[in-house]
């Protein structure tokens, strides 16, 4: 079963405009009941482009890539719904400390105080 806090590779194409596309890591942010019963998942895309100014809706994490940990940004300002058919394979489970940061950034992204 796919669980909240897991990171998977997913095919995000096709896209429009400034959306993140291609095959890239995504963080599952949907609750586990939804993950179990829904044909879709709510995810946040992840990028290795960490050279720009970080926003309060972004969380820096290290995720495995090519047998080493790579600094990456979870883009919680770009959350989207994907069909489960777009999910390719699991990369890792995010640490609980990082999920606390994700929850804070998600609140900012959707305007929850």
Over which residues does each language-model region extend?
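Conserved functional hotspots at enzyme active or ligand-binding sites that engage polyanionic ligands
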Residues: 1-113
